[in-house]
Amino acid sequence: MTVRQEGISSRPRQVERRTPRTGFRPDIEGLRAVAVFAVVLYHAGVPGIAGGYVGVDVFFVISGFLITGLLWREVTTADTVRLGRFYGARARRLLPAAATVAIATAIAAAVVLPPLQARRVFLDGIASALYVGNYRFAMQGTDYLASDQPPSPFQHYWSLGVEEQFYAVWPALIIGTGWLVSRTRRGGASRAAPYAAVLGLVGAASLAAAALWTNASPSWAFFSLPTRAWELAAGGLVALSIRQWRRLPLLPAAIAGWGGLALILLTCDQLRPGTPYPGVAALLPVLGTALVIGGGCVTGGMGPGRVLCRPVMRAVGRVSYSWYLWHWPVLLLMPPLLGAPAGLPAKLAATVVSAGLAVITMHVVENPGRFAAPLRRSAKASLALGGFATAATACACVLLLTVVPVPAGHGAAAPAAKIVTLPPMAVPAVDPQEAAVRQAFAQARDAVAAAADRRAVPSNLNPSLAQAPADKAAIFVNGCMRSWREVGQSECAKGDTASPTTVALIGDSHAAMWDPAFQQVAEQRHWRLETLAKVTCPLLELPIVSPYLGREYTECETWRGQIMARLKAEHPRLVVLSMSRRYHADFSFASYDPAWIDALSRAVSQLRSIGSAVLVLGPVADPESSVPTCLSAHVDDATACAPTRSVAVSSGGVAAEQAAAAAGGGHYADLTDLFCIPDRCPVIVGNTLVFRDDNHVTTEYAQLLAPVIGALADRAMAGG
């Protein structure tokens, strides 16, 4: 993506009206400008560039072309690759600028981000400095409870990780191929065909992996070298076939170049963030880039080089590496710095600022390190510079981890809130189960109200702010909750598993988060509890698209059918439905819309028809942002993180759901009073942290509310 351009020497052939291009390729410098414009404007949210992320693919093909050509030329002339010189050149070119931006980004994160979020950024910085950031981001992408975290200012370093891993394996591949060829072919290893065959095999395997993983594990497909190597191999194949490209007549070469540029621009416009990627969709920008590079092997004024070689394009191309490094952290860190969300004008201003920083970095850091004569003469000095840059970045992030402490409450210890099961009060005209619900809710309301005005985060907060992100109920990690691509349901019964009374808790992650409360109730009442949950998959018959998978969520539809068949066979005494209310148009429906309300009524009616009592749990309050992160920045004023009730809860949506559940013959539990007072919704009750992230309750708060949950379940079962 960002290596020095070194062409492949070949004896030029003089043909009328065309000239084979040798040596430095100014058109590739201009092509870099196209790539960086696409990425930067896409991240800035400029309309019409929804697929601008393909700019990274353009960079990969360019890198594959330049590096493969350099290695092949050396191995065919010297029978080997001087690895010290090769890695020294890469270190000079890439690492000083990357380290400069990384250290500046980490320091800025320490200043403007909440401590809890900043510490995650420092860990991202360490992984990026060690060139494994792409795999850290891939792992975070497969963790459902981490997938809602705000993007990292280091996330764009994933492509540098891919490049560095490419540099680690590609020379060995070329050297190994040369060694084999030299022993099987008389006259040495000078012909390109064997190398092209090896690259073709590697590329085909990588493309197959990309197509498979894009559906099976999108984050790993996007971030990993095995699924991106084919893009680099495509550039390498162009380098190995350069003599054939140079023999093209002028007109076909120009058509290839313009067609390739059109493919790149078309994908920038037509692809969408939800397009499964890279998969086979990446073939378009990769093919387009290969055509531009291949067609550009012939000059004559007809190809896209007449645009790409213009001074302004070349100037942007020269600064593209530093601009790529700066643009993302500036875009992400500007809103918290200014204390307000950034609209399009502000984002465009941020891209200008990042461009200015890029120019400074190129002149002050990048070029001096790249072209310094002592470094160019000494591979050891170049490698030492690269090692220093890597160590400096990692050490800076480690140091910041010690400077920015693990956030903790330092207010007075708060008494633990308590909600207990009381003997039902004798209330005229009120049955005992209804009385128990009222008593439990009254205790919860009192606990919430008592905590509403507490400002300082208590020193005995449970779980602590540092522990909150890992406060996952067992169901989230033991395989009992189905992930995106999983169907069926593991046998994860709890409570008294031999009991004739079965309670089924069903839904998405918002059903799973209530599992600790229901488990406590099931153990007390000797019920058999079956929690049947699948991420972002409510048990409502609605066509659903997964923004994560970027396609129709067929696994959800299959799982729903399997669960309904299981319920019809088991006839549980009570079915509890719980689901997030954060579904929006990207899922092909939205929470509380008419289709949602109708589907809820039908689901309740269908479950009642199999003989089960049905309880629908209403929504929890929506804090809209990560509560632990917010509190880490407001340890002296927890009320700053408490959302207003009117924003956190849709009273109209709750009323519509309540009517739908009643129409289907079920019970509905409005949970608003368990989280909110009339004007706002506290995020700490007693000494218990309510939310572990931006929408899931902590295990501790779910268990605190177990008496309320038990009373609601008793009432639903008694009412049939």
Where are these regions (language model features)?
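Extracellular/periplasmic envelope-modification machinery, especially enzymes
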Residues: V3-G7, P273, L338-L348, V352-G356, ...
